[in-house]
Swiss-Prot record:
Protein name: Sodium channel protein type 4 subunit alpha A
Extracellular side: 141-147, 201-206, 263-361, 387-393, 612-622, 677-678, 732-760, 782-792, 1070-1082, 1135-1142, 1199-1250, 1273-1289, 1393-1403, 1453-1465, 1520-1541, 1565-1594
Record: glycosylation sites: 204, 278, 291, 332, 1210, 1224
Gene field: scn4aa
Organism, scientific name: Tetraodon nigroviridis (Spotted green pufferfish)
Catalytic activity: Na(+)(in) = Na(+)(out)
Length: 1863
């Protein structure tokens, strides 16, 4: 449990006095002494209480500190600091500040008045106001003269603040002093810079002035809560290091490839050629000289003065498309862009976009690749490169977009999401612990005060009874109830006690039928700090009733006076008649039918608002305004009557009612101010009524909840984002503002500031916001052009990386986390929703009753018995069973016992006892809260008996169920419905049941044909029942069996797949050139007939084989049937000559669906499609919700901009007339009549009605074409008036708001919903992957089990001396590292290449490259010599070998290869793959390896999705070819990018897959009449006339493609990457990963050179020391190795598995993980070594150590024994020498080693020296010379040697005379 706070109550606050300081000193001494005495048994070191950290709010449990204690030093509340010199100060807002109790600056003690005064000032809010006002001044682009004075004032205030901080805290010595807080470094720096810039002249002042901007960061230090978010951001940036490195590496490799492929290509332009003297500069197509190759030389040599370079560099001689700033690019390869007649393709001039877009050097190539990765304006680069290099290079972009853009960018998202998730879980865990403590505290209080204070349960009628729910209540729903935190009047969070709703007459909760007080778990997720942490409990001492009351006071949101006021004025209970009237009103207003009526009114009102358009007739306008009045009246009446029925006190306790009241009030205000100019904005508030639908629409409700909760939780993050945006906007303005003004002519032809500039704060803010949207490159070019490349790159990249990649991904991570788990359980406060369903239920019940009555009457009239229908009823009921709408599963938990549940279930009105509504049946399709059980499912299996009976009652003919018949699910696509579920279904899945998604694949194949027709058919037409055992029936049966055999044969299926592919391929040839290729056309027509015949035959065969029943119950067969029908109809029409009919033509375009038949045949695609179909209900739901959400913005757009986008243009120059010439439409018409050169036109994408508004919003949300819409809006004035430049500037804000809410939230919601849905499907399948086929799953598992390797037998060292030396050389790690360094150097030499390098540099680089090739060839040769045939057993070696051969071939044959293939330099790029090997050598690269591992694991699923995406692109491109092949070439459609041929279509669609440039391709298709296009234009080579588009088809085509590809399929890609990243993270998040085991094996191989799997025990210490972390056991390691208790085999050898397990155990400890690891390692080992040497351990290291110890003990004992004997003998010798020996005394030691040694020592020969050695003395010999007798096993014999030292120790020195010994 989390740390328990000290006892609550105000008694805790004590002044900090000298006595307190003395007490701290005393405690400090005591702890010091205790530490010196020695550590006690191990216990966790104490940690500071997180609730009492400096900067946090004081936990509510302490109550309100008395006023006299605020802002004064108090003793520290946190027990952790009791022995440290600190004190705390609590501010008025109850924020805790902690100070150091040492004298500040060695002068001011904590009790000095100066310091106390400083503390009081320090915590004042003045500083915040100063910072904000300073920020306002910084936003001024032209500050007034007096601003300098203000600047001094600010500097003064900041200096004063810093001084106060230093006085109150101390400067830097000791904790909690000024410089110990990193945030104060910021202050220190800002102040220092202010003084430095003031007194020292430092040149570039504007750059230094930008330092002042950092003051805005000071807001972070002042606002509580911001610091934590910033910490989280820094945390996620740390986590991103690996991704960043990988990204930079990948981009570098791609940039090198780009450099080699496209260097210099983007400078190829169309130059007017040949030069003709009489040719004017402005006649691009009028070339007078024949365009032949000799022209070049003729002109050059005939005109000596002609300057070729100047001519081609001159822009007048280059070909420009109208309206384009850059010359048209071209290329010289066959599929590159062509030049118009009279022009030649040459390399001239600078690169496009001011020269910044190119692949001419590594830096620019890297920038281009970064742009591709972030997908900003990448379609332009794509088109430019393809135009210059050729269409085949599309492949390069495909790889970069899929690997670079989709993978790396989403990896960043995955990392940020993971960092957020980890923090989130930590805070949730903490919250849970606090919750438990709080419950425990309440339990204690309750037990103490039970008798007097609290009743056990609230009585039903009491008005304010409170029930304290204890933690051990049986209710599973407990957590829901306890987790909500309420906000009090001051906006602080406090925990909530469960208020039981009073009964029917008095309850607010029940008035809104079930607006319960239980909180959603959702709030738990994000109320991180305050509410949850304040639930901390205390070690309850004896607490009085006062404490309980105080605690309850703390729980109540507002001061008591408010409650008195509310009870007096907001509860209207006066006289009896009023009460009766009120009850009557309540009865009517609360009736479900009224709710239904109100909902219908909301829908109608929304429709009325959406019907507004331009131009509108007066009658229509009048009708709309009357409608508005009526609806306003209805809603006002509803509010008024509800107020009467419920009393304001209860009415305003329900969120929806507050919402209603606000909208009604605004609507009434708007009616009053209808004619006031400029207040039309109020009309927009009516739109919020749409949100009332959320009451009855769970998904919308959920979306609003998610946005609400995210915005709540994002409060701080949003602030941080706002600060970042502000800082960068000011930085941009200060750094570049002046440059924009001074150098404006470089970027604008009129020398006026463009729309995007940084000259003032608002525009600077817009640029920063645009970068956050992901559009940075265009503004950066302009910035680089006016202010230089360096600073612009730095600033823009910082905004991009910090703002876009980190902060916005944190937003997204937060959104995704809102989906996790069941925190969005629909059905907590959906009482209103239930009313709606009750109403619908009543209606349907009425309808059913009427229907039954009619049927019964008819049957009676027909004379049938009445019994029959009644008998059939249950069957029908049964058939409905699988699709019944279930009770919301949450409600099954609400009542504790099953019986109550049954009763509730049966109540016809649907209202449960206690006023809690139970029927929670979601409305929208696919919304059920729990999944639908199939008929075979026994739902009740695991439930309690009582509950199961209840369930059965529900399953039976329950009247409720009849009532909800209307709402039943529509089965989706027959067999594929298994995946239906709500967007965020909260169903808790049981372990996988028999029914799974892949049901149809799993079923065993029938061996015989099934019945042809259903039983019902046979019943109605008896003739269909044929006897198959005889006659014709038998022949028919045999025919069916034959057909069945054919159809089931593998070859048949293969043949059909082949035909499908051929017929699909045939469609690709039907392009605009088909009429010119007669042969191809004839072949295709013939093939079409053949295909149709084959497919019809296949269909008939399947009908006969499977029967109609089986065929038509399979969704895939229906698809086949539909597509074959289309082919048949179009073929018949062709034969009858009707092919030119409109309907037949459109039917022919449907042939594009043919490839869909491939779906069911390719398992990979089918798997993905099944998963998608499962997600369709959710995706549709979110789509609908998005549409509703966008509807508001669309209607608002129509209100603001309808008819205002029209403008008058000059038809020759295509430019706008200024207002001075043309002010409005009539002026324009006058000019048109006079000159024919004016035209009153509208912007193609506009807001003239809601439909067009939606298209505009889609363009804004995808950030494509949005700038044009924005410009039109910002320039708009009034209807039929000519627009003026930025006259309506603040309309930008509409777009900013829509982008944040409409684009950001709703589009990212798609990702959330898709990921959530796939996770649900996975859970259904028992956590199997839903995007992979069985084969691919095997690959995936193999990837995961990469590490099941045993130590390999190392490559044997060659016996040859020279080979052996080479072998030793190349085996060293040094050699590997050396080669890696060379590869990196090689990469660097490739990087320094540029397009315009000098011949010397080129020559030098060529030589360097040759040198590298020589070195790498040498490496290869050395390895070949040393490794011999083993060289080819390693994949890397083969790779190196191939690269070397390619490099040599490339250098030798470079000219030949370049002529026919790609540039040979590309082979060198391949070598970069070897850098991958570095990753193995760098220990720190584990994170990067994880990321690559995640990619490897994602590959199979990504391949399937890629296939599906290609299929979709194929179908759409065929469709595009048949519809848009002839549209006018303008905007995004030109000679290369169009729908004329299949290749061009695919290129266009690939570009749109990322939503790139789709607005430009759509524009020409929106042309439908002259003068925009020409419907009578002849298209050469075909009979199709005109070049107009079809706007409706075009919009449908693009919107559907964008939704399918960009929003769904691409997001599936994201879902998979996130999923696999988590898996890879788990794998690598383990303490050990495969790499560690690999490292273990490699080290083992060095010690066990023979590959025996054993090493000597003596080697173990060195081996364990040689291992790398985390497995390493560093020396000295003897004891630890002995503790490991390793088994030893004969010869003191140890087996590798035992060592591996032991070192693994050291890392993991005794955990479950370790047990699993042990099993898996042993299993892998046994699997890999079936014939392994059986090793029987004879002892273990511990046993061996014990034996050694025992031997030592014996040795010591024997030594002591000898010692004593030695002393005896020495004394005897001494006595003998001095002659004091008794005659009868014998020598103690007559013989043996002791006697002999001592005799020698004392200079006298011992007697009997030659005697046999004593049996006590073991023979002295060293191991090898000892005889053959080995010691017995398990017995260690240690020879005891008697050394001279020992004897010397026991004998006295000769020169000392001893005194006489006393006897």
């Amino acid at each position: 449990m989390a740390t328990i706070l000290p006892p609550p109550g105000t008694a805790m606050f004590r002044h900090f006095t000298p006595q307190s300081l003395a007490k701290i000193e005393r405690l400090k001494e005591e702890t010091k002494k205790a530490a010196e005495v020695g550590p006690r048994e191990e216990e966790e070191p104490p940690t500071p209480n997180p609730d009492l950290e400096a900067g946090k709010g004081l936990p509510r449990i302490y109550g309100e500190p008395p006023a006299e204690l605020l802002s004064t030093p108090l003793e520290d509340l946190d027990p952790f600091y009791k022995a440290q010199k600190t004190f705390v100060v609590i501010t008025k807002g109850n924020t805790i500040y902690r100070f150091n109790a040492e004298p500040a600056c060695y002068i001011l003690s904590p009790f000095s008045r100066v310091r106390r005064g400083a503390i009081k000032i320090l915590i004042h809010s003045l500083i915040m106001i100063t910072i904000l006002s300073n920020c306002v001044f910084m936003t001024m682009s032209n500050p007034p003269a007096w601003s300098k004075t203000v600047e001094y004032v600010f500097t003064g205030i900041y200096t004063f603040e810093a001084t106060v901080k230093v006085l109150s805290r101390g400067f830097c010595v000791g904790p909690f002093t000024f410089l110990r807080d990193p945030w104060n470094w910021l202050d220190f720096m800002v102040i220092s810079m202010a003084y430095i810039t003031e007194f020292v002249d430092l040149g570039n002042v504007s750059a230094l002035r930008t330092f002042r901007v950092l003051r805005a960061l000071k807001t972070i230090t002042v606002i509580p809560g911001l610091k934590t978010i910033v910490a989280a951001l820094i945390q996620s940036v740390k986590k991103m290091v690996d991704v960043m490195i990988l990204t930079v590496f990948a981009l570098s490799v791609f940039a090198l490839v780009g450099l080699q492929l496209f260097m210099g290509n983007l400078r190829h332009k169309c130059i007017r050629w040949p030069v003709a003297a009489n040719q004017s500069a402005f006649e691009p197509f009028n070339s007078t000289v024949g365009n032949d190759t000799t022209g070049l030389n003729d002109t050059l040599f005939s005109n000596i003065t002609f300057d070729f370079t100047e001519y081609i560099e001159n822009a007048e001689n280059q070909y420009f498309l109208p309206g384009s700033a850059d010359a048209l690019l071209c290329g010289n390869s066959s599929d590159a862009g062509r030049c118009p007649e009279g022009y030649e393709c040459m390399k001239a001039g600078r690169n496009p976009n001011y020269g910044y877009t190119s692949f001419d050097s590594f830096g620019w190539a890297f920038l281009a690749l970064f742009r591709l990765m972030t997908q900003d304006c990448w379609e332009n680069l794509f088109q430019q490169t393809l135009r210059a290099a050729g269409k085949t290079y599309m492949l390069f972009f495909v790889v970069v977009i899929f690997l670079g853009s989709f993978y790396l960018i989403n990896l960043i998202l995955a990392v940020v999401a993971m960092a957020y998730e980890e923090q989130n879980q930590a805070s949730q865990q903490e919250a849970r612990e606090k919750e438990e403590e709080f419950q425990w505290l309440l339990e204690q209080l309750k037990n103490q005060e039970q008798a007097q204070v609290l009743g056990s349960r609230a009585s039903p009628t009491s008005e304010k009874s409170v029930s304290l729910t204890t933690s051990d209540a049986p209710d599973e729903d407990q957590s829901l109830e306890n987790d909500e935190a309420l906000k009090d009047c001051n906006g602080r969070f406090i925990p909530r006690l469960i208020v039981r709703a009073p009964t029917m007459k008095e309850s607010a909760a029940d008035y809104e039928s079930g607006e319960k007080v239980e909180g959603s778990t959702h709030s738990r997720l994000h109320v991180e700090d305050a509410g949850l942490k304040q639930r901390s409990a205390s070690a309850v001492t004896v607490l009085t009733a006062a404490a309980v009351e105080e605690l309850e006071e703390a729980q109540r949101p507002c001061p008591p006076i408010w409650y008195k006021f509310a009870n007096m004025f907001l509860k209207w209970n006066c006289c009896q008649p009023w009460a009766v009237f009120k009850e009557w009103v309540h009865f009517v207003v609360m009736d479900p039918f009224v709710d239904l009526a109100i909902t219908i009114c909301i829908v109608l009102n929304t429709l009325f608002m959406a019907m507004e358009h331009y131009p509108m007739t007066q009658e229509f306008d009048y009708m709309l305004s009357v409608g508005n009045l009526v609806f306003t009246g209805i809603f006002a009446a509803e509010m008024f009557f509800k107020l009467i029925a419920m009393d304001p006190y209860y009415y305003f306790q329900v969120g929806w009612n507050i919402f209603d009241s606000i909208i009604v009030t605004l609507s009434l205000v708007e009616l009053g101010l209808a004619n006031v100019q400029g207040l039309s904005v109020l009309r927009s508030f009516r739109l919020l009524r749409v949100f009332k639908l959320a009451k009855s629409w769970p998904t919308l409700n959920m979306l609003i909840k998610i946005i609400g909760s995210s915005v709540g939780a994002l409060g701080n993050l949003t602030l941080v984002l706002a600060i970042i945006v502000f800082i960068f906007a000011v930085v941009g303005m200060q750094l570049f503002g002046k440059s924009y003004k001074d150098c404006v002519c470089k970027i604008s032809t009129e020398c006026e500031l463009p729309r995007w500039h940084m000259n003032d704060f608002f525009h600077s803010f817009l640029i920063v916001f645009r970068i956050l949207c992901g559009e940075w490159i265009e503004n950066m070019w302009a910035c680089m052009e006016v202010a230089g490349a360096g600073m612009c790159l730095v600033v823009f990249m910082m905004v991009m990386v910090i703002g876009n990649l980190v902060v916005l991904n944190l937003f997204l991570a937060l959104l995704l986390s809102s989906f996790s788990g069941d925190n969005l359980s629909i059905g907590e406060d959906d009482g209103e929703m239930n009313n709606l369903q009750i109403a619908i239920g009543r209606i349907t019940r009425g309808g059913n009753w009427l229907k039954t009555l009619v049927i019964r009457t008819v049957l009676q009239l027909l004379g049938r018995e009445q019994g029959k229908p009644a008998e059939e009823d249950p069957a029908e009921e049964g058939e409905q069973k699988p699709e019944r709408i279930e009770m919301n599963h949450l409600d099954q938990l609400k009542t504790a016992d099953g019986i109550a549940n049954c009763l509730v279930g049966r109540q016809p009105s649907g209202t449960a006892a206690d006023g809690e509504s139970v029927i929670n049946v979601p409305i929208a399709l696919g919304e059920s809260d729990s999944e639908h059980q199939s008929e075979g499912d026994d739902y009740q299996e695991d439930d309690v008996d009582s509950e199961s009976t209840c369930e059965e009652n529900e399953h039976g003919s329950n009247s409720m169920e009849d009532g909800f018949g209307v709402l039943q699910h529509v089965k989706l696509m027959g067999a594929l419905t298994d995946g239906e579920s709500s967007v965020c279904s909260t169903a808790d899945y049981r372990p996988p049941e028999p029914e799974t998604l892949e049901e149809e694949e799993e079923e065993p194949e029938p061996l015989e044909p099934e019945a042809c027709f259903t039983d019902n058919c046979v019943k109605h037409w008896p003739c269909l029942n044929v006897d198959v055992t005889q006659g014709q029936g038998k022949k028919w049966w045999n025919l069916r069996k034959t057909c069945f055999t054919i159809v089931e044969h593998d070859w048949f299926e293969t043949f059909i797949i082949f035909m499908i592919l051929l017929s699909s391929g045939a469609l690709a040839f039907e392009d605009i050139y088909i009429e010119r290729r007669r042969t191809v056309k004839i072949i295709l027509e013939f093939a079409d007939k053949v295909f149709t015949f084959i497919f019809v035959l296949e269909m008939v065969l399947k009908w006969v084989a499977y029967g109609f029943k089986t065929y038509f119950t399979n969704a895939w067969c229906w698809l086949d049937f539909f597509i074959v029908d289309i082919s048949l109809i179009s073929l018949s029409a062709n034969l009858m000559g009707l092919s030119d009919l409109g309907p037949i033509k459109s039917l022919r375009t449907l042939r594009a669906l043919r490839p869909l038949r491939a779906l069911s045949r390719f398992e990979g695609m089918r798997v993905v499609v099944n998963a998608l179909i499962g997600a369709i209900p959710s995706i549709f739901n979110v789509l609908l919700v998005c549409l509703i959400f966008w509807l508001i913005f669309s209607i608002m757009g129509v209100n603001l901009f309808a008819g205002k986008f029209y403008h008058c243009i000059n038809t020759t120059t295509q430019e706008l007339f200024p207002i001075s010439v043309v002010n409005n439409k009539s002026d324009c018409m006058a000019v048109q009549e006079a000159t024919q050169e004016a035209r009153w036109v509208n912007v193609k994408v506009n807001y003239d009605n809601v439909g067009k508004g939606y298209l505009s919003l889609l363009q804004i949300a995808t950030f494509k074409g949005w700038t044009a819409i924005m410009y039109a809006a910002v320039d708009s004035r009034e209807v039929e008036e000519q627009p003026s430049y930025e006259i309506n500037l603040y309309m930008y804000i509409y777009f900013v708001i829509f982008i944040i809410f409409g684009a950001f939230f709703t589009l990212n919601l798609f990702i959330g919903v898709i990921i959530d849905n796939f996770n649900q499907q996975k859970r259904k399948l028992g956590d199997k992957d839903i995007f992979m086929t069985e084969e691919q799953k095997k690959y995936y598992e193999a990837m995961k089990k990469l590490g099941s390797k045993k130590p390999q037998k190392p490559i044997p060292r060659p016996t040859n001396l020279i080979q052996g030396m080479v072998f030793d050389f190349i085996s060293q790690q040094f050699f590997d590292i050396f080669i890696m360094v060379l590869i990196c150097l090689n990469m660097v030499t490739m990087m320094v290449e540029t397009d315009d390098q000098s011949p010397e540099k080129e020559d030098f680089l060529f030589k360097v490259n040759v040198a590298f090739i020589v070195v790498f060839t040498g490496e290869c040769m050395l390895k070949l010599i040393a490794l011999r045939q083993y060289f080819f057993t390693n994949g890397w070696n083969i790779f190196d070998f191939v690269v070397v051969i390619l490099s040599i071939a490339g250098t030798m044959l470079s000219d030949l290869i370049e002529k026919y293939f790609v540039s040979p330099t590309l082979f060198r790029v391949i070598r970069l793959a070897r850098i991958g090997r570095i990753l193995r050598l760098i220990k720190g690269a584990r994170g990067i390896r994880t990321l690559l591992f995640a990619l490897m694991m994602s590959l199979p699923a990504l391949f399937n999705i890629g296939l599906l995406l290609f299929l979709i692109m194929f179908i759409f491109s065929i469709f595009g070819m048949s519809n848009f092949a002839y549209v006018k070439k303008e905007a995004g459609i030109d000679d290369m990018f169009n729908f004329e041929t299949f290749g061009s279509s695919i290129i266009c669609l690939f570009q749109i897959t990322t939503s790139g440039g789709w607005d430009q391709i759509l524009l020409p298709i929106l042309n439908k009449e002259p003068p925009d296009c020409d419907p009578t234009l002849e298209n050469p080579g075909t009979d199709v006339k005109g070049n107009c588009g079809n706007p409706m088809v075009g919009m449908m085509f693009f919107c559907s493609y964008i939704i399918i590809s960009f929003l769904v399929v691409v997001n599936m890609y994201i879902a998979i990457i996130l999923e696999n990243f988590n898996v890879a993270q788990e794998e690598s998040g383990d303490a050990l990963c495969e790499e560690d085991f690999e490292m273990f094996n490699e080290t083992w191989e060095k010690f066990d050179t023979g590959g025996t799997q054993f090493i000597e025990y003596s080697q173990l210490s060195d081996f364990c020391d040689t291992l790398q972390e985390p497995l390493r056991v560093a020396k000295p390691n003897r004891l630890r190795l002995i503790e490991m208790d390793l088994p030893l085999v004969i010869g003191d050898r140890i087996h590798c598995v035992d060592v591996l397990l032991a070192v693994t155990q050291e890392v993991l400890g005794d955990t479950i993980e370790m047990v699993a690891m042990r099993e898996s390692i042993e299993a892998k080992f046994n699997l890999n070594n079936p014939t392994s040497v059986s090793y029987a351990p004879i002892t273990t290291t511990v046993r061996q150590k014990e034996e050694e110890m025992a031997a030592v003990v014996i040795q010591r004992a024997y030594r002591n024994h000898l010692h004593k004997r030695g002393i005896h003998h020495a004394a005897y010798i001494q006595r003998s020498k001095t002659g004091r020996k008794a005659d009868s005394e014998d020598a103690p030691e007559k013989e043996g080693l002791l006697a002999e040694k001592m005799g020698a020592l004392y200079g006298r020969e011992a007697e009997g020296r030659e005697r046999a050695p004593d049996p006590e003395t073991p023979p002295r010999c060293s191991g090898a010379r000892c005889g053959p007798e080995p010691p017995e096993p398990n017995v260690i014999v240690v020879p005891v040697e008697i050394t001279n030292e020992f004897l010397l120790h026991s004998a006295p020195p000769t020169h000392t005379s001893y005194p006489r010994r006393q006897t």
